[in-house]
Amino acid sequence: MARVLNIEIPNNKKARISLTYIFGIGPTIAKQILADANVDGEKRVKELTEEELTRIRDEAKKYTTEGDLKREINLNIKRLMEIKSYRVIRHRKDTCKRSTKKNARTRKGPKKDNRWKER
């Protein structure tokens, strides 16, 4: 298995899919990393040369991933808790977080589906 950012990525998968195994790198960023490194995303990781892997590692270092990203997310949540933001209050009350209206199915009863009844 190849190592990128101290994470072992699967050898038998395509490079663009393997990079998504790293926390903080999704499909879009994986494609961007491969494009910047001039590496074909359809190649399997085991087919990549050491030079290509080095270029991928260098490009991936530019992004916030794994522990740093998790730490940043936790700090953002703590900051919201300290200032007692509306979102945190809604989280604590276990209600809708983004001020959308709740589904009133409990009051209305189960959804009636008339599509399958004979006409």
Curated annotation (Swiss-Prot):
One of its GO terms (cellular component) is cytosol. GO terms for molecular function: rRNA binding; structural constituent of ribosome; tRNA binding. PROSITE patterns: RIBOSOMAL_S13_2. It comes from the Bacteria. Residues 92-110 have a biased composition (Basic residues). GO terms for biological process: translation. SUPFAM superfamilies: S13-like H2TH domain. Transmembrane segments: none annotated. Keywords: Ribonucleoprotein, Ribosomal protein, RNA-binding, rRNA-binding, tRNA-binding. Residues 92-119 are annotated as: Disordered. PANTHER family: 30S RIBOSOMAL PROTEIN S13/40S RIBOSOMAL PROTEIN S18, SMALL RIBOSOMAL SUBUNIT PROTEIN US13M. Part of the 30S ribosomal subunit. Forms a loose heterodimer with protein S19. Forms two bridges to the 50S subunit in the 70S ribosome. Belongs to the universal ribosomal protein uS13 family. Located at the top of the head of the 30S subunit, it contacts several helices of the 16S rRNA. In the 70S ribosome it contacts the 23S rRNA (bridge B1a) and protein L5 of the 50S subunit (bridge B1b), connecting the 2 subunits; these bridges are implicated in subunit movement. Contacts the tRNAs in the A and P-sites. This is Small ribosomal subunit protein uS13. The lineage of its organism: Bacteria, Bacillati, Mycoplasmatota, Mollicutes, Mycoplasmataceae. The gene is rpsM.
